[in-house]
Regions:
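Conserved glycine-rich cofactor-binding loop
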Residues: 6-7
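The beta1-alpha1 cofactor-binding region of Rossmann-like NAD(H)/NADP(H)-dependent oxidoreductases
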Residues: 32-33, 53-65, 96, 219-220
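Substrate-binding pocket helix/loop in short-chain dehydrogenase/reductase
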Residues: 90-91, 98-103, 206
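Active-site helix of classical SDR
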Residues: 114, 158, 166
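Residue(s) in the substrate-gating loop at a strand-loop-helix junction
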Residues: 142
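Short C-terminal tail/terminal secondary-structure segment
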Residues: 147, 226, 237-257
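Short, small/polar-rich loop/turn modules that mediate ligand/substrate recognition or access, typified
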Residues: 174, 179, 236-238
Length: 257
């Protein structure tokens, strides 16, 4: 299952998982046509796929989504908890609704989806023909789990919280052979941040923060997710893989600060 999978990074991850041979549930909250298009692309690789509409911040909808998945797909092996959004504002102007919406989707959504997945992982246990692990969870975080971001306090708080959520969950579940990791994308060309890259001036400014000198593409993250979910990464647990062109290297200090 990939949540928030009808656009951007989620879409790329869902397609890459299908290309790698996985059956895929494409979760989305709005945009039926886009979700169905992703499903058709995935089916083109000869695997099963279906689009499930659910708000990941809603406990009842998440429970119903997983119940449907168990009925139609039998089980779950990999959860990519990708759904996320921004509601930006200066701190003194930020409303409680903006705060709650971001925390609800970006952090509570991780909790609700992971809880359902872990219940199934523990019920089923390891299937050696499928994986060395009983289950894999990938939390889609951000470089802003460690980089402060003024004007985006709710978003950065959700990602910082996600880091400790992921690590605590990984610690708790490791004895059950369940792996939990995060991916922290940096500047990536997606609909959520169009204003940061859609003009030359904006792009040039953004590149001052990226030592590698190019914007990331959703496929950069998708390929990382496929690897992290595979048995090639079986000994990796409780870690964040930053896919960021070096944004977390504090580029302002490259010339002595």
């Amino acid at each position: 299952m990939v949540t928030g999978a009808n656009s951007g990074i989620g879409q790329a991850v869902a397609i890459a998982m299908g290309q790698a041979g996985a059956d895929v549930v494409v979760n989305y909250v709005a945009g039926d046509d886009a979700a169905n298009a992703v499903v058709e692309t995935i089916k083109g690789y000869g695997v099963k796929a279906a689009a499930y509409q659910a708000d990941v911040s809603n406990e009842d909808q998440v429970a119903a989504m997983f119940k449907r998945m168990m009925a139609e797909f039998g089980t779950i092996d990999i959860l990519v908890a990708n759904a996320g959004l921004q509601r930006d504002a200066a701190f003194t102007e930020m409303t409680l609704a903006q705060w709650n919406t971001v925390i609800g989707v970006n952090l509570t959504g991780q909790f609700l989806c992971a809880r359902e997945a872990v219940r199934e992982f523990k019920r089923r246990g390891i299937v050696p023909a499928v994986s060395r692990a009983a289950g894999k969870i990938i939390c889609m975080s951000s470089v802003h789990e460690i980089i402060p971001w003024g004007g985006h306090v709710n978003y950065a708080s959700s990602k910082g919280g996600m880091r400790m959520f992921m690590q605590s969950l990984a610690q708790e579940l490791a004895p059950s052979k369940i792996r939990v990791n995060s991916i922290g994308p940096g500047a990536t060309r997606t609909p959520i941040n169009t204003a940061a890259w859609n003009t030359q001036e904006a792009y040039d400014k953004l590149m001052t923060l990226v030592p590698y000198g190019r914007i990331g593409e959703p496929e950069d993250v998708a390929h990382s997710a496929v690897w992290l979910a595979s048995d090639h990464a079986d000994y990796i647990n409780g870690q964040t893989l930053f896919v960021d062109g070096g944004m977390t290297l504090y580029p302002g200090f490259a010339t002595n600060g």
